[in-house]
């Protein structure tokens, strides 16, 4: 452009100068005939100007062509990005439709489960009432039979009485089987209801977070945990025949380890795992076997329980207190190290209520492993979000809630599960460990904490 402007400026000057020379010559000289061709100098100037103009135009064309190529490349990149974004938008819309369909199905299923749960509750209450009536009738018949036997000891039992007793026993067994079936179905419904609620919450969070702009990157989600103990509560069940403790269940003839419903005095009904050891029933309050359950939980979860009774779990401080306040109890701790060596120790103990932060006071009785828990001292329970005075960073340092004294010590059966066995001492201290004051440090693979009343007859 600059060259063109320069030529446009030079050419008029040359022409003007030439005209002036011609005029001056015309004035000073006699008229001469004009030449038919331009002067040689003028031709050279014009040729030089045109040459420069050509070079300038050539440079301009090359530069313009490069700019056009850059523009086309950017347009191609933009087209590809737009196409990719369109595909992602279509995929997101399809996923959203699928999520909405799934949400609708889950809502329908949830309503069905709710209706089934209400129906089962109604049936369960009616069955319990019928059982109470039948028990009263059986008791009345037994009293009549006793009177008949006492009044007529030498008279053989009447066939009708025998058949009546057999019929009543069969009815009672049938009702027991039916109640057990209803409780099993109730457990399954509770589990399904919890799973449906969890899926609904995930879908609700997904629908709330609908994208206002499309991003090509996504952030990973943090893993979730299941804080509260599943399959462990049945509320609003009113029946005096529910046992208060595992010993009662055992005394009624149930000699198999498993999950059972109990209702301690002045407490709600909940499920426990009754573990029969050498012909004696124990209530399992803690179990660690494989690290599948996170034990670095909050105070609320330690208070009411978490995990699964058929796996790793903590029964809950409030439930433990509701059991042990009924009588004097023994605490049994079973340990298994990574060499498959099994150890145990038993304590007589006292557990306070929530106002004392569930203070534990114990004395070792027997066992085949040295005691590692301070005796005759008030041990206060602490978690990372509920620390007792003097515990400072004990829950964080040991990755779980536990009973501590003034010092943290090196014992915590609710610590982090190290799998496989931790090599360094700091890692072993943060995990499941057991160490007496002057003894060796045991790195633990599995643990059980169980309780049993000292006076079993009081629960018959």
Curated annotation (Swiss-Prot):
Region described as Required for inhibition of LPL lipase activity: spans on this chain: 32-56
- PTM (free text): O-glycosylated at Thr-226 by GALNT2; blocks processing and activation by proprotein convertases. In part proteolytically cleaved by proprotein convertases; proposed to be involved in activation.
- Result when mutating residue 344 to S: Abolishes protein secretion; associated with low plasma triglyceride level
Tell me the protein's name: Angiopoietin-related protein 3
Self-association and partners: Interacts with ANGPTL8. Interacts with ITGB3.
The record's annotation in SMART domains points to:
FBG
Name the gene.
ANGPTL3
Highest taxon above the source species: Eukaryota
This protein's domain notes: The fibrinogen C-terminal domain is sufficient to mediate endothelial cell adhesion.
PROSITE patterns referenced in this protein's UniProt entry, alphabetically: FIBRINOGEN_C_2 (PS51406)
Q: Name one GO molecular function term.
A: enzyme inhibitor activity
- What is the source species? Homo sapiens
Q: Which GO terms describe its biological process?
A: acylglycerol homeostasis; angiogenesis; artery morphogenesis; cell-matrix adhesion; cholesterol homeostasis; cholesterol metabolic process; fatty acid metabolic process; glycerol metabolic process
Subcellular location(s): the record lists: Secreted; Cell projection, Lamellipodium
Question: What cellular component GO annotations does this protein have?
Answer: cell surface; collagen-containing extracellular matrix; early endosome; extracellular region; extracellular space; Golgi apparatus; lamellipodium
